[in-house]
Amino acid sequence: PERLESIINNTKYPVQFIFAGKAHPRDNEGKELIKQLFQFASKAEVRDKIVFLEDYDMHLARHLLQGADAWLNTPRRPLEACGTSGIKAAINGVLNVSILDGWWCEGYSKERGWRIGNGEEYEDLGYQDTVESQALYNALENEVIPCFYERKNGNRPGNWLKKMKASMKMAMEYFCSLRMVSDYEKQYYIPAARRWEELLAEEAEEAEEAEEH
């Protein structure tokens, strides 16, 4: 908490964290984490710099995607199924700061956003959380926040804007239904159709031989 307070109380580079989400009714650990976050956000010295939004849904997500500068995703690797919210963020020009898990394993490059850690996993989950939390703080302090406030030409963060454009281009080109269907066509449907024609050629002799074996 001390290092987090140092980040959000930095008057030179002000930062605001917005948290939103729901815990499954049986996810006691998740509910306890939300409780701790809410209690921390209620402290007078951080009250206006940490915001927790209740009842997260697609309507709320839409506003977050339109207004955030960076999208922070911290699943406990390797439990992230995909992370589609991060893909939506990238399409909207929001830069990802994420654990290397789910889609970010494929989508990450230093030109498009930031990674938390190096994708390592540990049997001791408490130790893993410690390693990744320190990696997150390092990324925020040394890379993410300075990049946003770097304004060499006028009032525009040049490097940040370059990352935004690269991230949007990557997400729209690669993480889309058009690419998915194209891959299915080239890698599965067309080869399967050609193989079907081969099996049926010459009165299906090859198919009969395969059946015999």
Q: What do these predicted ranges mean?
A:
Residues R3, L33, M180:
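Conserved alpha-helical elements of sugar-nucleotide-dependent glycosyltransferases
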Residues L200-H213:
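Surface beta-strand/loop "capping" patches
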Residues Y13-V15, L65-R179, D183-P191, L199:
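Catalytic binding pocket for nucleotide-activated donors in carbohydrate/polymer assembly enzymes
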Residues P1-K12:
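Short hydrophobic signal-anchor/transmembrane segments that target glycosyltransferases
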Residues D48, R195-L199:
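Short, flexible/disordered secondary-structure transition segments
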Residues T11, F19-H63:
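Nucleotide-activated donor-binding/catalytic signature segment of Leloir-type glycosyltransferases, i.e.
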